[in-house]
C-alpha cells in the first residue's frame, strides 16, 4: 500500500495533463489535478454539452486531438466503448516518445483494443469510487483509495508517475494499491456481471416474480425485494456481512443462514465460473465490440426488455409516494 509519503507530487506538476472526457471521473480528475497545481486541459469533441460546464469551472477545453498534441500525459476517461476510436483518430497521431497514456480502467489495453507505441508509458490510476465521491473527498482533505498499474514502462519511471498522479487526485491520502491491468479488468467485469449488476438485478426480479405469482400484491413484493435492499447493502458497506447480520433481527439472520445457500448453491458458483471464463478468454469483449459495431442494437433491445418488466412499472408508481427518494431524470422529465 502506498501513501502520501511514497509519492512525489512534483512529478505530475512538471507535466502537462490532458483529460479526455468530462463525465463522473473526468470532472473529478480535472478539477483535483488543477487544485494540486497541475497544468490540465480537458478534451471534448466539438458540440459536446459538457464544454460549457468545463469553461464555467475554470478549465481549458479543446478537441481531444488538440489536447493530446498539447499534453505529455493523457488520461483517457471516455466510455470504454468509445476509447479505441478516440485513440486511433485523436490520440495516436499526436503521441510523442516519452508521453504517457493513462486509463481509469484496463479493458482496452488488456484485451488489445488499444495498442500504444512502445515508446509511450502506459499506466492506470483507478479510484475505487464514483467521481463525485473522489472530488468531495479531495475537497474535504481526504481521499478515495486508488489502484495503479503500469503496462508499458520505457523510461522506468511509470510507477512514480502513476503514484504522483494518484496523489494529485487525493488517492494517496487513503491508500493506493498496486495491481495489473489484467487483474483490475477481469475482477471489475466479473463483479459487475455476476454480482453487482447482472446477478443482483436477476435475483431481485426473480424474487419479485415468485411473490407476485404466489398471489401477493406487487407493491408488497417491490418493497420486500427491491426497496429494502438498500438498507441491507448500506449495512454491508459500512461493516461487512457480519455487521449486517448483527443489525438485522434474529429471525432475518436465522432465515438467511438457512435459505441463502438454497438460492446461491454450488450450481450458481459453477455458472459464475463460466462467466469468469468468458471474461478471461475474451468472449465477453468480442460480444461487446460486436454490439458497438452493430450500432448498439443488442444493448437497446435488452434495455427495452428490462424496462418493460412489471417491477419497473410498480416501482415508478411507488417512488411517486417517496418524497425522500431522489428522482432520476427519466422519471421527472
From Swiss-Prot:
Example of a GO cellular component annotation carried by this entry: cytosol
Binding site for Mg(2+) 1: 188, 192
BP GO terms, sorted: isoleucine biosynthetic process; L-valine biosynthetic process
UniProt: Mg(2+) 2 binding residues: 188, 224, 228
SUPFAM superfamilies per UniProt: 6-phosphogluconate dehydrogenase C-terminal domain-like, NAD(P)-binding Rossmann-fold domains
Every KARI N-terminal Rossmann domain range: 1-179
Chain sites annotated for binding substrate: 249
Superkingdom, natural source: Bacteria
Residues at the catalytic site: 105
Residue ranges of every copy of the KARI C-terminal knotted domain listed in the record: 180-325
Enzyme class: oxidoreductase
Name this polypeptide is given: Ketol-acid reductoisomerase (NADP(+))
Species of provenance: Mycolicibacterium paratuberculosis (strain ATCC BAA-968 / K-10)
